[in-house]
Amino acid sequence: MKFEWDPEKNRLNEVKHQIDFESARALWDDPDRIEIEAPYPLENRYVSIGRIDNKLWTAIYTIRKGSIRIISVRRSRKQEARLYEKEKVREKQ
C-alpha cells in the first residue's frame, strides 16, 4: 500500500492529536479495521477505525492516483469505538 499526505497537515495533526501520519499507517495493519464511506462534496472520502498499540484511532482519507492520502487521524470517539467493537463481534460470529 502506498501512502501520501500533505507535510504541513501532518505536522499540525501531530501537534493537535499526538500522532503523525507515518505512525498512523499502522492503522491499516489491524485485521479488524473497519471502513466507512464519508460523504464529501469534492471527492470520495473514507473513515477507517482501527487499533494502533491497543488504542483506537480514526483516520480520514481519500484515494488519489492509487495512493491512500491521509487527511487526518485522531483518537476514536465513543460512537466510533462502539461501532468498531460491534463490527468486530459480528465478524467473528
Question: Model-flagged regions — what are they?
Answer:
Residues 1-93:
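Ribonuclease/tRNase effector modules and their secretory precursors
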